[in-house]
Curated annotation (Swiss-Prot):
Coiled-coil blocks: none
Pfam families (UniProt xref): YbeY
Family (UniProt): Belongs to the endoribonuclease YbeY family.
GO CC term, one of those recorded: cytoplasm
Organism of this sequence: Rhizorhabdus wittichii (strain DSM 6014 / CCUG 31198 / JCM 15750 / NBRC 105917 / EY 4224 / RW1) (Sphingomonas wittichii)
Protein name (database record): Endoribonuclease YbeY
Annotated cofactor note: Binds 1 zinc ion.
NCBIfam families assigned to the protein according to its UniProt record, in alphabetical order: rRNA maturation RNase YbeY (TIGR00043)
Cofactors, names only: Zn(2+)
């Protein structure tokens, strides 16, 4: 079973049901991976999502990634990649997969640049962050391609177009 805990700062209050959006994004991402069984597992797998401002994400990015600027999304996995497979044997009853943190200003700017609604872009970022929590990365080109393919599939199930498509003007 999956639980998605959402904490949104006031500047995210724009009429969007962020909790529903986050649950749908996390679920769609998980369904595209071999870890889809977690959605129906006896234990509780939790993903924590914080929707905050650029200043907080900037500070976290500087502290944990040594990058002195805000970024769109940060992911903090709490389970090592090689241990995810063994979660079915967990007797704890619950496991925190990790935290996903989005920066409002960066998200809004990027959505405007792409010509998509902020909620759609945030959905993409939550899918992306969820895949990181499940052990996926994009350091190497082949990893990036595999992760982007999973993102495309997950987003398509939510009715969202390919965010990586190259469009001609």
């Amino acid at each position: 079973m999956i639980e998605v805990a959402v904490q949104a700062e006031p500047d995210w209050a724009d009429g969007t049901d962020w909790e529903r959006l986050a649950i749908e994004a996390v679920t769609a991402a998980m369904r595209t991976t071999p870890h889809a069984a977690m959605l129906d597992a006896a234990y509780m797998a939790e993903v924590s999502i914080r929707l905050t401002d650029d200043d907080e994400v900037h500070a976290l990015n500087r502290q944990y990634r040594q990058k002195d600027k805000p970024t769109n999304v940060l992911s903090f996995p709490m389970v090592q990649d090689d241990l995810i497979e063994g979660l079915d044997n967990s007797d704890d009853g619950e496991v925190l997969l990790g935290d996903i943190i989005l920066a409002r200003g960066v998200c809004v700017r990027e959505a405007a640049e792409k010509g998509v609604p902020t909620a759609e872009h945030a959905t993409h970022l939550i899918v992306h962050g969820t895949l990181h929590l499940l052990g996926y990365d994009h350091i190497e080109d082949d990893e990036a391609e595999a992760m982007e393919d999973l993102e495309r599939v997950a987003l398509a199930t939510l009715g969202i177009d390919d965010p990586y498509a190259i469009t001609e003007d």
